[in-house]
Amino acid sequence: MKLSDFDYYLPEELIAQTPAEPRDSSRLMVLNRKEKTIEHRIFRDIVEYLKPGDLLVRNITKVIPARLYGVKETGARVEILLLEKISEGVWEALVKPGSKVKKGTKIILSEGVEVICKDYSQQGARILEFNCSDDKLFELGNAPLPPYIKNQKVPFERYQTVYSKETGSVAAPTAGLHFTEELLERLRNKGLEFADLILHVGLGTFRPVKVEDIREHKMHSERYYVPAETVKKIRETRKNKGRIIAVGTTSVRTLETIARLPNQESYHGKTDIFIYPPFEFKLTDAIITNFHLPKSTLLMLVAAFAGKDFILEAYNTAVKMKYRFFSLGDACFIY
């Protein structure tokens, strides 16, 4: 398949710049893959589409305040975006302007807090060594909001899910942003089960596909962990004929990664799984997700799940009906 097969027209004003308030008041497009039907609801109505015995699989990663600002000894300003922790005090990061940060460059973040560029990494990234603890670093950091969000004053807690626990992502698993504690309680009371996993979202989420033949695209690898309790719940749900419902594409990618590995009690590692049509989903029965960028790997994933033509029809309908798109936008439930 070609990259151009996954394009659609999106007016810029439909890119959400602020989150819905309350979280579960965003709109919800419900897509039935078998019947090819489209319904328009509010996110909290999702309770009506979920059944006792369904398993909701959530990514409990927590976003770090990964965007930092500093100055070189020359006085030139530098922006740093943390990508992944390598060891104590050492991070892989993107720097702007990259041409100004070479091996040995020192950057001052605040009084007594500085960083030295130790080496070059893949695709323009740098290996940086900080002289402070992570806690101090995160005190200085800002929310790493995606570049298409012009409103950089979105409160940091609104870019975290209410169930986030494990620090390590540079972008939110945004499908989870729609859930409130009250909505989760309603789902529990209805007899739904919850299972948690971790995939620390890296910058690959926003990396554009630059090749027309999508099979040539290489995904950035991301670290994941699926605990034994979650593996057990997944197997029990399968045995009892319940549905496995992935909250977000990060949960989908983790589930479909472990589905291709030998049976284990728990799973951890790095995944660079790239899901595009045609693809056999082995563990995912339904997906809760946001509306994704044209020509993005995430759009390809939902196209693989629901069929490319049906997804593009749904997206064109969403544009006509002025749904809000991307990270802070509205949601889709695809089953």
UniProtKB/Swiss-Prot annotation:
Keyword field contains Cell wall biogenesis/degradation:
no
Q: Name the GO cellular-component terms.
A: cytoplasm
> Where is the major localization of this protein?
cytoplasm
UniProt GO BP: queuosine biosynthetic process; tRNA wobble guanine modification
Gene3D superfamilies, alphabetized: QueA-like
Q: Mind listing the UniProt keywords for this protein, alphabetically?
A: Cytoplasm, Queuosine biosynthesis, S-adenosyl-L-methionine, Transferase
Q: What is this protein called?
A: S-adenosylmethionine:tRNA ribosyltransferase-isomerase
Q: What is the lineage of its organism?
A: Bacteria, Thermotogati, Thermotogota, Thermotogae, Thermotogales
Record InterPro entries: QueA (IPR003699), QueA_dom1 (IPR042118), QueA_dom2 (IPR042119), QueA_sf (IPR036100)
Q: Which domain of life is it from?
A: Bacteria
Q: Does the keyword tRNA processing apply?
A: no
List the GO molecular function terms: S-adenosylmethionine:tRNA ribosyltransferase-isomerase activity
* Organism name: Thermosipho africanus (strain TCF52B)
Q: In which pathway does it act?
A: tRNA modification; tRNA-queuosine biosynthesis
Q: Provide the E.C. number(s) assigned to this enzyme.
A: 2.4.99.17
Q: What family is this?
A: Belongs to the QueA family.
Q: Which Pfam families does the protein's record reference?
A: Queuosine_synth
Membrane-spanning residues? none
**What is this protein's function per UniProt?**
Transfers and isomerizes the ribose moiety from AdoMet to the 7-aminomethyl group of 7-deazaguanine (preQ1-tRNA) to give epoxyqueuosine (oQ-tRNA).
Subunit structure of this entry? Monomer.
Q: Which reaction does it catalyse?
A: 7-aminomethyl-7-carbaguanosine(34) in tRNA + S-adenosyl-L-methionine = epoxyqueuosine(34) in tRNA + adenine + L-methionine + 2 H(+)
Please state where this protein is localized.
Cytoplasm
